Swiss-Prot record:
Predominant subcellular localization, coarse grouping: cytoplasm
Phosphoserine PTM positions: S328, S339, S364
UniProt biased composition (Gly residues): 19-33
Taxonomic source organism: Mus musculus (Mouse)
A single Gene Ontology CC term: cytoplasm
Biased composition (Basic and acidic residues): 39-52
Location(s), subcellular: Cytoplasm
Residue ranges, annotated region (Disordered): 1-58, 331-355, 370-422
Primary role: Plays a role in the regulation of cell morphology and cytoskeletal organization. Required in the control of cell shape. Calmodulin-binding scaffolding protein which is the center of the striatin-interacting phosphatase and kinase (STRIPAK) complexes. STRIPAK complexes have critical roles in protein (de)phosphorylation and are regulators of multiple signaling pathways including Hippo, MAPK, nuclear receptor and cytoskeleton remodeling.
Protein name: Striatin-interacting proteins 2
GO biological process, alphabetically ordered: cell migration; cytoskeleton organization; regulation of cell shape
Taxonomic lineage: Eukaryota, Metazoa, Chordata, Craniata, Vertebrata
Length: 844
């Protein structure tokens, strides 16, 4: 299998936002001949500057949700290079409207019946052979979907009429007509071969596809949006549209699978002209519309737990996070207080050696982590810097993700809330959870200690154990949490053991199930393609000749000639990449969450292919930049955003017009993308010790700690979760040097009562036999997919009658006159015909 996320050679990652890396990575390996003390002093200056800058970062008032505001989601469909086409669409509509409607009324003045008649005429005129005429009619439809902005006075009016027109277009069958046109354009070999011959693909090569995808996206996004004032007819149309997109109709695949096939075709190089940003945005919104967003997912989870007889959920995680407050990273002096009191590095190194000799009991991974690269609280010496550089070079050659400097500035640790905040909220935010496995493990250890033998999975017999153990078991059982996945795994084990007695499983035809069935056999290719595009869109990626070109639908035919035009194009390119990252991160997270709810092994199948395609190091590569700069980047030009650009005259291009407008303290889509990627990384590594070891091997701790500078509660929570799962592997010295981060983990992350996360004594922290864990999981996934989806046409368990007496005793319906000529029939049809017994057995 190809490794799509294999990055380029190690080096300082360039930030497409123009912000640089921001963490001192520009030093390289230079200055090796300088004394250690001046270099260390310069390092501390850099650390102070970075830490002081992060303290000034205000708390970001960000509300996480399925997507951004309606206007923002519509505006991200268009690149600034496409703005001239708004006028073209309007002209095409007005020319057609004047020839077809004899009345002098405008579109908004027509009665609904007249509007429907005109739309029917538009759809009839789409049925022409001429591509040029077809494109003009499609542009007229696009103008309607865009809100007939030529007749509107405000942005609110444009958005209102865009929704109205999209519902009208859907009710007249426009989506189905455009779906047929999309199939034609995908199969258009002439456009593909023309794009392949060109040295540089531009926005002109995808005109037809962009028009079709824009109409479909506007329809999906406008119809998906629910409002209380929507009329009953719109609500009915919404449910019909959702069903139409979710289920395969007329023996065709669900719409999402068509878009997935476009993504793989684009990544294979067969269709470089595909407007991939529009494809990904439409794919994300179709999946969200058909499967449901996060609120719908929570409702499905509650419903499924009730069906399985499980107790209700203690809390809604997203609602709990919304009530949490972000913590400030500690100041430089607090963070390095212990280091400033420490002895000189040379003496410290000597004392380390003597201390190791005195210790008789070590963490399970102390030997594994003898050369700890996370001791950033102490001044780094030249020898330690070279050791850090050697440690980075040990990474897999195809995964040179941590393009770090040998001197990694100490990331500011998380600190507990100040004394005036401790009272709010009272107690810890999460209810503790205990797994059945945890209770069994606790009782096994207790029985071994007190009575000398174990009772397997028996958690009820407490004979011979002291009273405190009884109380502990009672407390553990009070907080026992049984997940839907536990029930599904147990059912799967029973189906594997007793396939005949339990019979065939009844699988409900939910949208998630239908989508998984359609994706199953091409799922590895889909995941690889998405990660390839994500790698190309990451701000830390460098331009390489072998990387895919994701800018085909943003680059103009003629490159800019002035500085201002170049600035505008640079902003457009960065914005284009940010939107791609946003759509892929949200799409992958939605797929994982819905598949996990539908069946745990569907989730594990997608997860394994993401891991095999190097998703974990790719996300770490993404975060190996100045995340604060990425989140606060202003790659947008407000006056050029839809619908503003359709109402106001486009201003003359000046430096002021490029910088005017958006004064928000952060970029919503970039913060949304970062949280999605952290949640994705958390889902891939949770309870998977082999994957957690990947976080350790790729030196993720300093990368993740740098992200704590962003004062946003949800982002900090998922960073702390990822740090928590690997603390047991990082060694005692790392935990000692990062006590403020450990305190933040204790304060904000859910507790497992007997989880030994803060120490290395857990049996799961042993650094061996991780491959067996992944192999066992893969075998279970293959058994699940084979049992449920690889059903032979003739069941292996169908009854076969081999008894001669019963076969001869069967009564056959024969014609009344058959006995008159049965001897002739025997001669012709039996005795004179050669019998192929193999074929006969197969047919019967």
């Amino acid at each position: 299998m190809d490794d799509p996320a294999a990055p380029g050679p190690a080096g300082s990652p360039a930030n497409d936002n123009g912000n640089g890396n921001g963490n001192g990575n520009g030093n390289g390996n230079g200055g090796k001949g300088k004394p250690a003390v001046p270099k260390g002093r310069e390092t501390f200056r850099n650390q102070r500057r970075e830490s002081e800058g992060s303290v000034d970062c205000p708390t970001l008032e960000f509300e996480y949700g399925d997507s951004d505001g309606h206007a923002a989601e519509l505006s991200e469909l268009y690149s600034y290079t496409e703005n001239l086409e708004f006028t073209t669409n309007r002209k095409c509509f007005e020319e057609d409207f004047r020839t077809q409607v004899q009345d002098t009324k405008e579109w908004l003045e027509l009665e609904e019946d007249a509007q429907k008649t005109y739309v029917m005429g538009l759809l009839d005129r789409l049925e022409v052979v001429s591509r040029e005429k077809r494109l003009k009619v499609a542009r007229a439809v696009l103008y309607l979907a865009q809100g007939t902005f030529g007749e509107c006075d405000s942005e609110v009016d444009v958005l209102h009429w865009s929704r109205y027109n999209c519902f009208l277009l859907y009710q007249m069958g426009t989506f189905s007509a455009f779906l047929e046109l999309l199939h034609m354009e995908i199969d258009n070999s002439q456009a593909s071969s023309s794009a392949l011959r060109k040295p540089a693909v531009s926005i002109a090569d995808s005109t037809e596809l962009r028009v079709l995808l824009s109409v479909m996206y506007l329809m999906v996004e406008n119809i998906r949006l629910e409002r209380e004032i929507d009329p009953c007819g719109w609500r009915t149309a919404r449910e019909t549209f959702r069903t139409e997109l979710s289920f395969s109709t007329h023996n065709e695949e669900p719409f999402a699978l068509l878009l997935f096939s476009m993504v793989t075709k684009f990544c294979s190089g067969l269709a470089p002209h595909f407007p991939i940003k529009k494809v990904l945005l439409l794919l994300w919104k179709v999946v969200m519309f058909t499967l449901g967003g996060f609120e719908h997912l929570q409702a499905l989870k509650i419903q499924k737990r009730a069906e399985l007889g499980l107790p209700p959920l203690a809390e809604d995680s997203i609602q709990v996070v919304k009530s949490m407050r972000a913590a400030s990273p500690p100041s430089y002096t607090l963070d390095l207080g212990e280091s400033q009191l420490a002895p000189p590095p040379s003496k410290l190194r000597g004392r380390r050696g003597s201390r190791r000799q005195l210790l008789t009991k070590q963490d399970s991974l102390d030997i594994y982590n003898e050369r700890d690269l996370f001791k950033t609280e102490e001044p780094a010496t030249e020898e330690e810097e070279e050791s850090a550089a050697d440690g980075e070079r040990t990474l897999d050659g195809e995964l040179d993700l941590l393009e770090q400097d040998p001197l990694v500035p100490p990331p500011p640790s998380q600190t507990p809330l100040s004394t005036d905040r401790v009272a709010f909220p009272k107690g810890l935010p999460w209810a503790p959870k205990v797994r059945q496995k945890d209770i069994e493990h606790f009782l096994e250890m207790s029985r071994n200690k007190f009575i000398g033998f174990t009772l397997g999975q028996d958690t009820d017999t407490l004979v011979g154990l002291p009273r405190p153990i009884h109380e502990s078991v009672k407390t553990l059982k009070q907080h026992k949490y049984i997940s839907i996945a536990d029930i599904q795994i147990k059912n799967e084990e029973e189906l594997e053991k007793c396939p005949l007695s339990l019979g065939e499983e009844v699988v409900p035809e939910t949208p998630s199930e239908i989508l998984y069935q359609g994706m199953l056999y091409s799922l590895p290719q889909y995941m690889i393609a998405l990660l390839k595009i994500l790698l190309a869109a990451a701000p830390t990626s460098k331009a390489k000749t072998d990387s895919i070109n994701i800018l085909a639908d943003v680059l103009p035919e003629e490159m800019p000639v002035t500085v201002l035009q170049s600035m505008k194009l640079g902003i457009d390119v960065n914005r284009h990449k940010e939107i791609i990252v946003k759509s892929i991160s949200a799409l992958l997270l939605l797929l994982l969450k819905h598949f996990k709810l539908n069946h745990i092994y569907q989730f594990e199948y997608v997860s394994q292919h993401l891991v095999f395609a190097n998703c974990i190091p790719l996300i770490l590569k993404f975060f190996n930049q100045n995340i604060l700069s990425y989140i606060t980047a202003k790659n947008s030009i407000s006056v050029l955003d839809y619908p503003c650009c359709t109402i106001q005259d486009l201003p003359e291009l000046t430096t002021e017009s490029l910088e005017a407008g958006d004064n928000s303290q952060f970029c919503w889509r970039n913060l949304f993308s970062c949280i999605n990627l952290l949640r994705l990384l958390n889902k891939l590594t949770k309870w998977k010790h082999s994957r957690t070891m990947m976080l350790v091997v790729f030196k993720s701790a300093p990368i993740l700690k740098r992200a704590l500078k962003v004062k946003q509660a949800m982002l900090q929570l998922y960073v702390l979760k990822l740090l928590k799962i690997q603390t047991k592997y990082l060694g005692r010295q790392w935990r000692k040097s990062n006590m403020k981060t450990m305190s933040a983990i204790y304060q904000k992350v859910r507790h497992r009562m007997n989880d030994d996360w803060a120490y290395g004594n857990d049996i799961d922290a042993r650094p061996w036999d991780f491959q067996a864990e992944e192999c066992t999981l893969r075998a279970n996934i293959e058994a699940f997919n084979s049992r449920r989806y690889d059903k032979p046409q003739d069941s292996e368990f169908s009854p076969v009658d081999n008894c001669l007496q019963s076969v001869l005793g069967q009564r056959l319906d024969l014609p009344e006159d058959f006995h008159y000529s049965y001897e002739l029939w025997l001669e012709r049809e039996v005795f004179s015909q050669p019998i192929c017994w193999e074929e006969l057995l197969q047919n019967h």
